[in-house]
Amino acid sequence: MIDVLIIGAGPIGIACGLAAKKKGLSSIIIEKGTLVNSLYNYPVSMTFFSTSEKLEINEIPFIGNNSKPTKQEALEYYRRVAKSNSLKINLYEEVQSVKKEKHFKVTTSASDYEAKNVVIATGFYDLPNLLNVDGESLPKVKHYYGDPHEYAFMKTIIVGASNSAVDAALEIYRKGGDVAMVVRKEAIGERVKYWVKPDIENRIKEGSISAFFNSEITNIGPKEVKIDTPEGERKLENDFVLALTGYQPNLDFLEKIGISVNHKEHKKQIYNPNTMETNVEGVYLAGVICGGMKTSEWFIENSQIHAEKIMNHIVPKG
């Protein structure tokens, strides 16, 4: 019998494992991908907006070479934290069901577990926001961006104007790619990193990167893409489409467990903010998942406290 079963091995899932260990509780972390899978799926050359200190968990120092750490530095930090604290983490194992009996029976793709308590720290990176247009299922369409080399010398359309979309556009352009951006709004977003925003705006102004504002993709074909623009329909020759339009948490999974969701307020789950316990006794939420569709509400720095709240509530129950 496990005291705490944690679903998700992201930074906050790891923080929950550390907090459980500190309180003398037995725990296991189940992760369907690799360690800190969301971070692993970030672009290869990504630099965080946050400083190293804001990515730290459990007051374990994050020493980086620069004030703003890279993806590789973050991966190394969380690997080191997990290994040095001997956390029990099962990777590439997907949770299929959580059922409340006397305790919780958790069925995964590899095994069955019994746990007194379950913590859900699954983040929001699982489900991409789809374009819902014909041709989106073609292999050329991707919702995650990794390495710009893949798009060198190719015609790539990037949908969106977020940090990830802008980074992808600039990196692919500098690897010799032919880049066009399709943006619903009238300009590059104000939340784009301040040191990157002038770069993308200047590349667009000089014509190195094409940009179609107030525009949407209407159809994706094997060799071309149709775009609805203020000037009418345009057809662009195209090899790849990177639809970097954001992601959302797997709320269906939560509702199957019995967790109530407020569909009127960003589909936020109903939980006690003092203990992080949901309406299902013994099931807790931690991290960005707590914000429902409002995925910018919680992040590593301000949701670490969730781990401490959860374990403080579990310990007296025995």
Predicted features, each with a name:
Residues 3, 26, 155, 177-180, ...:
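Residues at the starts of beta-strands that form the adenosine-phosphate
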Residues 9-85, 166, 170-194, 263-266:
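Beta1-alpha1 glycine-rich phosphate/pyrophosphate-binding loop at the start
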Residues 86-99, 105-107, 112-114, 174-266:
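A Rossmann-like FAD-binding core segment of flavoenzymes
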Residues 122-175, 265-274:
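Glycine-rich dinucleotide-binding loop and its adjacent helix/turn
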Residues 136-150, 247-297:
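FAD-site-proximal beta/loop scaffold in flavoenzymes
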Residues 121-122, 159, 242-245, 286-289:
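Short, well-ordered coil/turn residues at beta-beta hairpins
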Residues 286-318:
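A conserved FAD-binding loop/helix module that cradles the flavin
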Residues 1-12, 154-159:
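Beta1/beta-strand and adjacent pyrophosphate-binding region of the FAD-binding site
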